[in-house]
Amino acid sequence: MKTFYTLAGILSLSEDEKELIKQQALEGDPVACYKLAEIYLYLHKCEDYVSSAHELLQKASEGGVADADASIAIMMFRGEIEPFDPVAAAKRLEKAINNGSDRGIAFQLRNLLYGRYGYKQNTDLVKQTLDQLLSQDEDPYWCALMGDFLMAEGKIVESQQWYEKAVAGGENSVYGDLALARGLNDDYSFRDYEAYNDTLMEGNDAMDPMCMYYFILDKIESYYDIDPEDTQARDEYRQMIIHALELNTEWCHPMTMELLGDIYREGQIDVPVDPVKAWGYYVHGSEFMHASCFGKMYDMLQTDEIQLGQMSNEEAMDLCMINGARLHDARLLVATVEAYKHGRLTQFAREIEMFHIPAYDAIPDDEPLDEEDEGPDDDGRFDAWA
């Protein structure tokens, strides 16, 4: 079942395997309903994938699949299920955990580790819980989470042993983390660049899209080392970067979508500025509930870099704000509350009054509210790379 907790696991499924799961789900098998829902949520390959996944998860939950309750709770926390109600989401998550959902336990541990979705950070409880789980069985899933814990604590070198165990057990989604652990010192300086790069290539073969993302970030820096007079070399290198990123978007990686948006919005690597393409990539990333994509869409609308035909820029900004607030983006949370105070977003009045205004009031006066203030969309892995 843990195959369906990670993008890398789902990407590795063959078309025949996915078709079999779909057939079993149509026949009413609750586990297959859960699996098919996760495929829809990760890959967005069916029309109206959110409502289709929700319906399948409800069937799986009724059939006793605890992980389905965890997935529903996650959708509720992210604002994919209306009305937005994080209190109800927390209760649904508690139900999943009480029924033995590994997915629910892992989600809760990450919330406590990174202080996400309104949970107060509690690394002591995370460590205690992981020690208990690993004393029973060194499951690769929990090994990966222990690696995440150590990485978040700044113990990059120590995290390597746990990521090694996770990968050895088939947890392919942590190759990007393993590359960092093999290559970096605790102060983020390189101790073995070759091991780092080799692991990225290994992880790319194992379908961890984070590996290609890290690899291309490195190549973007290298682009500027090419002699500007050598236009052919720069053209070929640029084409390689764009092609690799486009392939990675097919692996449903929202950080890659955001990066492509940045390239076209800012004209990086000598790409002609194209706000329409930039907007398209940010929209694609936002479909995966990637908070910073909502922030960049908001910025483009605010500065009139893009004009939408279907709705006014102000209406679109409202949608960006409320989604960002739901995802605990501090800057968009502030924008949401300020806009509401000026008579906008009234259709979300209950939600804003109950949840966003209290969160707004709790923000310290001296807290920075720029884009760097967002929560860790990649569980802190980009910070470790940087």
Map each language-model feature to its residues:
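TPR-repeat structural position
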Residues: S14, V50, P86, T123, ...
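Single-residue signature of alpha-solenoid repeat helices
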Residues: E17, A53, A89, V126, ...
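Short helix-capping/linker turns of helical repeat alpha-solenoids
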Residues: E27-D29, Y42-H44, G63-A66, R78-E80, ...
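Residue-level detector of the short coil/turn that links helix A to helix B
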Residues: H44, D48, F84, Q121, ...
